[in-house]
């Protein structure tokens, strides 16, 4: 009977962990109050509707050390879901995906769009998202634009509900976001440009 009680408690703790979420906004502009954060309230509401207990994290700085520190802190506090929005673009100062990879070296980081190297302000070769897992905790690095977060949210929620592995969740998020980029007519969506580069 004691063992049953212990396994029930373990299950309850795991259930509680998986339902505790923290959402981190990222970026210098938010910290300075130059732009309003619409993503965090939106994600908080969507997750709470589905029974999550959501904490709003501090704004992450535009450096990978700060991202790593805040992710590490959230992991040690037992959050089952850690979401960052912003900081996944192609400019050099975007560090969310790198932070997730430091925590989980096998994180899934598919591209949502590819650029010609060295065009405009883009230093990297495209925009990636990241999904990593450490113990019972899942980390998801989403883009910053609010329309992209709105596009990703239903996929994220379904993936959590159906307990997809990190590769599946990352690929399906990337597919939805690549489609959105294609409709915006920006860049070349990664999923559809293999072997059929435009001449």
Where are these regions (language model features)?
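Short catalytic/metal-binding and nucleic-acid-binding patches
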Residues: 199
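Short glycine/threonine-rich loop/turn motifs
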Residues: 28, 38, 52-195
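Glycine-rich phosphate/diphosphate-binding loop of Rossmann-like nucleotide-binding domains
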Residues: 5-62, 66
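Helix-enriched interaction subdomains in cytosolic or periplasmic regions
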Residues: 1-2
